[in-house]
Every structure is written in structure tokens, then in C-alpha cells.
Amino acid sequence: MTALFENPTHNLEAQGLRCPEPVMMVRKTVRKMEEGETLLILADDPSTTRDIPSFCRFMDHTLVAADTETLPYRFLIRKGSN
């Protein structure tokens, strides 16, 4: 699974931030991305384990991978549902 997190198009460092800041930053970053680009998010707020997958479903983006077993949590999303 580690290979999935290599070479994202964009990176977002959200460690130390608390709800709702991480998802707000994800939304702002994704708005500037092109369709199909990827974003690697590093976070340590437990609420991101439900908020980021929910954001992807609600906004029709793809959650490519999530690693929430250890800190920092890692999420890889692709803009759009392709």
C-alpha cells in the first residue's frame, strides 16, 4: 500500500490542525487542482478518518487510499470520480 502514496501531484500537511480545518484546507486545495490530479494529505486529527472519506463521497472525488493505522494518517484523493 505504501507505493500508492508515492508521487502525488500535490501534498497537504494538516498535522496539528483540528476539525474543521483539515477538510477546509483539502477543499481549498482541490479547487485549484485539475481533474485527475492527486492530493496526499497528512493529518493527525482523529476526525479526519471520517471527514475526508465523507468529503470525497459528497464532492464526487475518489479516495484512492487511506492509511489510518498509525500517525500521521495518510489519505490519497484524486480529483473527480475517474
Curated annotation (Swiss-Prot):
Family, similarity comment: Belongs to the sulfur carrier protein TusA family.
Entry GO CC: cytoplasm
CDD domains, per the entry: SirA
Subcellular location: Cytoplasm
GO molecular function: sulfur carrier activity
InterPro entries registered for this protein in UniProt: Sulphur_carrier_TusA, TusA-like, TusA-like_sf
Gene: tusA
Gene Ontology biological process terms from the UniProt entry: tRNA wobble position uridine thiolation
Domain of life, per lineage: Bacteria
Function: Sulfur carrier protein which probably makes part of a sulfur-relay system.
Designated name of the protein: Sulfur carrier protein TusA
Residues at the catalytic site: C19 (cysteine persulfide intermediate)
Keywords: Cytoplasm
